[in-house]
Amino acid sequence: MTSFPASHGFGPRKRGYQMDLTNVQPVENKPAWISMKSPLEKEIANEYEALKVTERKEDTQDYNEPELHNSNDPTVDLYADTYATQAATESDSELEDALFSQLDEFDDTAYREQRLEMLKKEFARVEAAKEKGHMQFLTVENEREVMDFTLSSKKVVIHFYHPDFIRCKIIDSHLEKIAKVHWETKFIRIEAANAPFLVVKLGLKVLPAVLCYVNSQLVDKIIGFADLGNKDDFETSLLEFRLLKSSAIDRLKEESSSNKSIYHDELQNNQSDDSDFFE
């Protein structure tokens, strides 16, 4: 057997022969045999990932929000929505009195009492949701916040945007409207440049990108405007209906303001067929 000088490090047992050159290469350029893991290594890696998920869930316990279930009662849901959208302009006591007085019209005492109890619980859920940042379109600055919200909130809609892309601004204007009336869902946005890990992990190459999570699971991706008619002046209700199909919101709600984007007028004569590519 040929012997190699120890100082040269060329022997088959020497690290320099097999590892040094490949270690400096990007992972995707390494030979397949270097990327292969033994069953034990795979088991250790899986346990490590599970531990990280557990630790993250423990870290976000303080962020956990109350269950915001749909009451499945149209009357109660309507009053709760009214309470959520008007409480900012009317005193809570005046609004509650107005809503409760409408229930007094029912002759069935048992029915009225049942609905009053449901209303009180629904109002409490609305207040809890608002305290947790619902009914706002929040801008977050880092990926950790995005992951925390995704783990701690039952329903989350995330917009990955670029500040200079006009279509991202259009999506922002629609999501801001939707967020104000859908108190059951958290709406957030993050600049794509501030989320490099998530952009790569989620394979985002075109902006705007809207991702919907329910119970920490990705349920829908809306990339560009291809699924929104591929035009800039689509109505808010179109995006709202898409979110409903994904279960990212509970139900459609009436809007008092115009359904058109705030950019509708200036974009009527500036239609574009392409979304913006993010690199």
UniProtKB/Swiss-Prot annotation:
InterPro entries reported for this sequence: Thioredoxin-like_sf (IPR036249), Thioredoxin_domain (IPR013766)
Alphabetic keyword roster: Chaperone, Cytoplasm, Nucleus, Pheromone response, Phosphoprotein, Signal transduction inhibitor
Span of domain Thioredoxin: 137-248
Composition bias type Basic and acidic residues, residue spans: 56-70, 254-267
Broad class of where this protein is predominantly found: cytoplasm
Region annotation Disordered: where it falls in the sequence: 56-75, 254-279
Modified-residue entries (Phosphoserine), positions: 272, 275
Domain of life: Eukaryota
Xref: CDD domains: Phd_like_TxnDC9
Compartmental location: Cytoplasm; Nucleus
GO biological process: one example: response to pheromone
Transmembrane spans: none
Cellular component terms per the entry's GO annotation: cytoplasm; cytosol; nucleus
Family to which this protein belongs: Belongs to the phosducin family.
Function: Inhibits early G-protein signaling events following pheromone stimulation. May help create heterodimerizable beta-tubulin by facilitating the efficient transfer of nascent beta-tubulin polypeptides to the folding apparatus.
UniProt name for this protein: Thioredoxin domain-containing protein plp1
